[in-house]
A protein has these predicted regions:
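Membrane-embedded alpha-helical bundles of multi-pass transporters/translocases
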Residues: 1-258
Length: 258
């Protein structure tokens, strides 16, 4: 719900920003910093605190994190599409972006092994607090890289942009609502939305039960060791090195629609 409100607002702000830095870079930079800081703070939890306190703490920092994600993510995606006017080159840009992003799914499952290894950390609680800081620092640096290295044209003197005020933001939301109703009246668009909904929700639902399926059905409830980690990591490696290049190639040769 928070994203559904903030994303179109952030899109309007980014699209109509007048700046010597362009429309995207500054938001990618500051959004990455906010997101990284909030991620590190989000996991600084202690068992001795009350359930109500920890719940409130996580909820507040989650909102801050997703605010940073919105500030970063909306301009970042737009920046990727604006890097080229060529139809197929944009496909290559998005494929490379997805390829790099998949490495998070290759690496992240191994955190479970590190967290519960006493040679690394005395407890999983301490591991969570420490790892969150390291992850935040490393990936914040990665996230600000597009803002530093991808150059954008100055929009300081653009006169065709709408003013960044409350009336302009409210008007953009009304336009988005009208465009959504118009787009959703198209049968192909509805099919695409339904397919996307089923695919993403199906994937996330099944993925959340993976550990329990492996432990219950393969190990009869015993500790599964590194097998859940291998399942997630190997699956991500297959996607990274096989699926993404093949799909990108098919999109160029057969067309995205087919």
């Amino acid at each position: 719900a928070f994203d559904s409100i903030m994303d179109p607002i952030m899109g309007f702000i980014s699209d109509n920003t007048r700046s010597t830095w362009g429309r995207r870079r500054q938001y990618v930079f500051w959004g990455a910093l906010l997101m990284g800081f909030a991620f590190a703070m989000l996991w600084q939890l202690y068992r001795e605190n009350s359930v109500a306190y920890n719940f409130t703490y996580v909820m507040v920092w989650s909102f801050v994190f997703y605010l940073g994600l919105t500030i970063f993510g909306v301009p970042y995606v737009s920046m990727g599409y604006e890097m080229s006017d060529d139809y197929h080159e944009r496909t290559s840009v998005m494929a490379i972006s997805q390829w790099i992003g998949q490495w998070a799914w290759v690496i992240a499952p191994w955190f479970w092994v590190i967290m519960y290894d006493p040679a690394w950390f005395p407890s999983a609680d301490e591991a969570t607090r420490s790892l969150s800081i390291w992850v935040a620092v490393v990936f914040t640096l990665c996230a600000i890289a597009p803002a530093v290295f991808i150059k954008g044209e100055s929009t300081k003197d653009r006169s065709d942009y709408e003013p960044l005020d409350f009336r302009g933001i409210l008007g953009s939301i009304n336009k988005i609502a009208k465009n959504f109703v118009e787009a959703f009246s198209s049968p192909p668009f509805r099919k695409l939305c339904i397919a996307t909904f089923l695919i993403f929700n199906g994937f996330n639902t099944v993925a959340s039960f993976t550990y329990f399926v492996i432990r219950s059905h393969l190990f009869n409830g015993a500790a599964p060791g590194v097998w859940p980690t291998l399942f997630g990591s190997v699956g991500a490696i297959v996607t990274t090195f096989i699926v993404i290049p093949i799909v990108a190639r098919m999109a160029k040769t057969m067309g995205k629609k087919r």
